[in-house]
C-alpha cells in the first residue's frame, strides 16, 4: 500500500461503513513500511489524526506517537526554516527514524510527465511543476503535519508538546507565506522566488 492511497481510501471507507479497523491497520502497517514520497511520509499524520477524529479511539495514537514525531520531518529543515530532501539532510539516523531504507524524494502529484505509458512530452498530473530544493507542496504538507501533531498531542494530554507544535506551526505558517507567496501575482509559486516563478495552478 501507499500512504496517499490509504488516506483517500480511509476517508471513503468512513463514508460507507461503520467499522474503521481496515484503515487503521493499513496506517499502522505503513508506519513500519513507509514508501518513498516525502509528502506521503508526512501524510501519516493525517491518517492518524483522521482515525482519531472518526473513532474517538486514541489507542493507535498512543502506541504510534513516537513513530509519528519524526514523520513531521523537522530533521529536514534547512537554515531558512523550510524542509528539503535534496540538501544533504537525509542522514542514516533520520532514515532509521522514519523506518525507510533509501532516500525519500518529493512527488507533488502522480504520474509525472513522460512515464507510465505517457509520451516524453505528454503531460502527467503534476502540471509542469518546477521542482526545486524547496517545493511548496512538500512544505505545505509539513505545515499540515505540524498542526495535526498539535491535535494529536492534545488528544493524548501532552500539553508541553501541544505548546511546542502550536508555536512551530504558527512560525512555520508565516515563513511559508513569506517564502512562497508572490504578492504581486497573488498566488503561491512552486518553489522559492530565487529558483522559479512558475505556479502549477488548479482551477
Which stretches of residues belong to each language-model region?
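The feature captures the catalytic groove of carbohydrate-active enzymes
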Residues: 27, 32-44, 77-170, 174-203
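Substrate-binding groove/exosite segments of carbohydrate-active enzymes
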Residues: 1-93, 123, 135
